[in-house]
Amino acid sequence: MQTGHPADGVYFGLMSGTSMDGVDGIAVRFEAGKPPAVLSEAFVGFADTLRDALFALQQPGDDEIEREALAANALAARYAVCCHELLRTAGLSPDDVRALGVHGQTVRHRPERGYTRQLNNAALLAELTRIDVIADFRSRDVAAGGQGAPLVPAFHATVFGSPDETRVVCNLGGISNITILPAGGGPQGEGHARNDTVRGHDCGPANALIDAWVERHLKQPFDDGGRFAARGKVDETLLAALLDEPYFRQNAPKSTGRDLFNADWLDAKLAGFQHLAPENVQATLTALTAATVADEIARHAGDCRAVYVCGGGARNPVLLDALATALAARGLDAAVATTAALGVPPQQVESLAFAWLAYRFNARAPGNVSTVTGAAGERVLGALYPR
């Protein structure tokens, strides 16, 4: 008697987020009816030259096509290094891996114009790894009228749902987003999300601005432990000015990125606040992230009893404390913890999600949640580049 699913097997997931500091990779075994089994993980950093090129491509400029193509090749090379490290540490050969799901590097996200661009040379990546590559997950959702983001809520529902309580999974990456998992879902090892009840959307800036400010003033890539923010004091007048942004008033479904929330946006908002000490601005940016996330949870998940955080912000205790305070100020009795409390380390969640999306592609099963993205319906996401 045949058991399992034809798509079962080992998958790799690669995720390079809006921090653009490197790529997180994971090797995981998926079997129908069972939770994901992580085999190994790896992180490969980006050289400053690549990071600078990626940041430059966030905004329109001269000779974009040439610069974009060269950056895509450089990205594929770093992604391949990450894959070879996963093979080595998991004791696998390329033939052991069913496929690798790769997000690519978002350089432009404009679903209102019908497109989103995640930079990557998937053909080169397949050539360098000799593994089937599944890429370009967001475009199909956008083609179906959706935002193309966030895409991880279906995975969140698969592994983090609860039969007893409404939960919110909050990703604090460059941009913050939430997934609302109403009570009654429950983890489902076979990977079928309760798409009729799952909701989620992008809230606003998180590490994109926090990191940019600390890098400008301390020449550090991120606010380690939130210590820079902890030295400062929130300026309520500046916070009000930052919150006066039309995106925060938009109804869901909605998504955003560095197209909007970047250093130029911040500098425009800081006009008239040049007297503030840098640490006070940092404290206020941290409060902005907490406030925008708490506002969206209060608006859409008032019965939430637990918020589980993943992404780089999960390593910032000052930000987590600010989020807990902001939730309480809005009358929510919701505990704040990281996804480690549910058995998945925060740094693994997004790379796991893209491995899972590759698994869903091979199963020819939907990967989006139309109630989250606003797409016309559920769609199989991704495009295959054979080994």
From Swiss-Prot:
GO terms for biological process: 1,6-anhydro-N-acetyl-beta-muramic acid catabolic process; amino sugar metabolic process; peptidoglycan turnover. Keywords: ATP-binding, Carbohydrate metabolism, Kinase, Nucleotide-binding, Transferase. It comes from the Bacteria. Pathway: Amino-sugar metabolism; 1,6-anhydro-N-acetylmuramate degradation; Cell wall biogenesis; peptidoglycan recycling. One of its GO terms (molecular function) is phosphotransferase activity, alcohol group as acceptor. Catalyzes the specific phosphorylation of 1,6-anhydro-N-acetylmuramic acid (anhMurNAc) with the simultaneous cleavage of the 1,6-anhydro ring, generating MurNAc-6-P. Is required for the utilization of anhMurNAc either imported from the medium or derived from its own cell wall murein, and thus plays a role in cell wall recycling. This is Anhydro-N-acetylmuramic acid kinase. The gene is anmK. Transmembrane segments: none annotated.
